[in-house]
Amino acid sequence: MEKKLNVKLDEKVGEGTYANWFMLTFSPSEFVIDFGRILPGLPDAHVYSRVITTPQHAKMFLQNLQKTIENFESQNGEIKLPGAMPDNHGVGFKNS
């Protein structure tokens, strides 16, 4: 029997933080995901949150995110992505 998990959400965390940029790095034992923002006309991204997790949890997150995107697209249509952008373009998302 699966146990119910009670999730506590701090009010400040519940407000959320907007991110239009992220960067992923890893070592043999962990994945690091930085979430940040790039503002028009500014050359730098500001990191607002860093999540560090195990490779196993990173893969479970990937699977959960993929399923959630599939559900979203089945209800709202395909999410369109811009064409290929160079890593230093400064807008959108980046994988390392």
Q: Predicted regions: what is each one?
A:
Residues 1-96:
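Positively charged, low-complexity terminal tracts
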